[in-house]
């Protein structure tokens, strides 16, 4: 049976000389892997931009629940993303976020609210012209709202610790190693105040920004079983150096 669905490209890998496997997040089915002919041989009108991380596409697909790899009948661009393709800094952010999404949501079923959050976030990044160095911080921590472990920021005051295991600020040092020290917890509190509208007003040094994303990733390791190391983190760091 054929279905139509919006989708977000995450990454692709070579299958053989003629085919690739493209991993996407679909609105209707959640994360799905599709077998596609490589660009020169494809017959489904796939453009090169389809394979770019975080491309927004519309698909007509076969879908069988027990089949590990599905098939695309037709694909077309849903929303063109010009700056994400041509801006090297934005492209690097896309590579990082696509890997992050694929690892954070690999066990996730279809969730239209989550899909729309990611879709709208990509459009925000497309249209921002400058001052987007905090974008990945906002995106990653806000995604945890849809996964059920967004931190509680209501009780923060200066000098508190941030307990990563429980996602809360506490007065005393937690009896485990997964916490942010009281000297640095103010950064977490600032992070939780940020959104796409106000993120331009929050200034961090390069080292603070590196520390924040490392803490966010550790937070995901603690709360998502199987969440593995993000290989493209070094690429992200390099563009902001």
UniProtKB/Swiss-Prot annotation:
<dbReference type="InterPro" id="IPR012340">
    <property type="entry name" value="NA-bd_OB-fold"/>
</dbReference>
<dbReference type="InterPro" id="IPR022572">
    <property type="entry name" value="DNA_rep/recomb_RecO_N"/>
</dbReference>
<dbReference type="InterPro" id="IPR042242">
    <property type="entry name" value="RecO_C"/>
</dbReference>
<dbReference type="Pfam" id="PF11967">
    <property type="entry name" value="RecO_N"/>
</dbReference>
<dbReference type="GO" id="GO:0006310">
    <property type="term" value="P:DNA recombination"/>
</dbReference>
<keyword id="KW-0227">DNA damage</keyword>
<comment type="function">
    <text>Involved in DNA repair and RecF pathway recombination.</text>
</comment>
<dbReference type="Pfam" id="PF02565">
    <property type="entry name" value="RecO_C"/>
</dbReference>
<comment type="similarity">
    <text>Belongs to the RecO family.</text>
</comment>
<keyword id="KW-0234">DNA repair</keyword>
<dbReference type="InterPro" id="IPR003717">
    <property type="entry name" value="RecO"/>
</dbReference>
<dbReference type="GO" id="GO:0006302">
    <property type="term" value="P:double-strand break repair"/>
</dbReference>
<keyword id="KW-0233">DNA recombination</keyword>
<dbReference type="InterPro" id="IPR037278">
    <property type="entry name" value="ARFGAP/RecO"/>
</dbReference>
<protein>
    <recommendedName>
        <fullName>DNA repair protein RecO</fullName>
    </recommendedName>
</protein>
<dbReference type="GO" id="GO:0043590">
    <property type="term" value="C:bacterial nucleoid"/>
</dbReference>
């Amino acid at each position: 049976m054929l279905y139509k669905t919006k989708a977000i490209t995450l990454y692709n890998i070579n299958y053989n000389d003629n085919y690739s496997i493209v991993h996407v997040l679909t609105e209707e089915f959640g994360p799905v892997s599709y077998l596609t002919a490589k660009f020169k041989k494809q017959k489904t009108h796939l453009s090169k931009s389809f394979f770019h991380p975080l491309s927004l596409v519309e698909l007509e697909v076969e879908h069988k629940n027990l089949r590990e790899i599905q098939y695309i009948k037709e694909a077309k661009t849903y929303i063109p993303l010009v700056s994400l393709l041509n801006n090297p800094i934005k492209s690097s952010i896309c590579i990082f976020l696509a890997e992050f999404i694929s690892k954070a949501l690999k066990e996730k079923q279809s969730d239209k609210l989550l899909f729309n959050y990611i879709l709208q976030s990509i459009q925000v990044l497309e249209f921002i012209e400058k001052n987007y160095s905090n974008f990945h911080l906002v995106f990653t921590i806000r995604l945890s709202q849809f996964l059920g472990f967004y931190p509680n920021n209501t009780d923060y005051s200066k000098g508190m610790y941030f307990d990563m295991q429980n996602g809360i600020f506490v007065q005393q040092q937690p009896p485990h190693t997964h916490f942010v020290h009281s000297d640095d917890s103010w950064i977490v509190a600032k992070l939780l105040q940020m959104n796409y509208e106000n993120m331009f007003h929050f200034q961090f040094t390069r080292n603070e920004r590196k520390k924040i994303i490392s803490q966010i990733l550790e937070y995901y390791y603690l709360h998502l079983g199987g969440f593995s190391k993000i290989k493209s983190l070094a690429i992200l760091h390099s563009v902001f150096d």
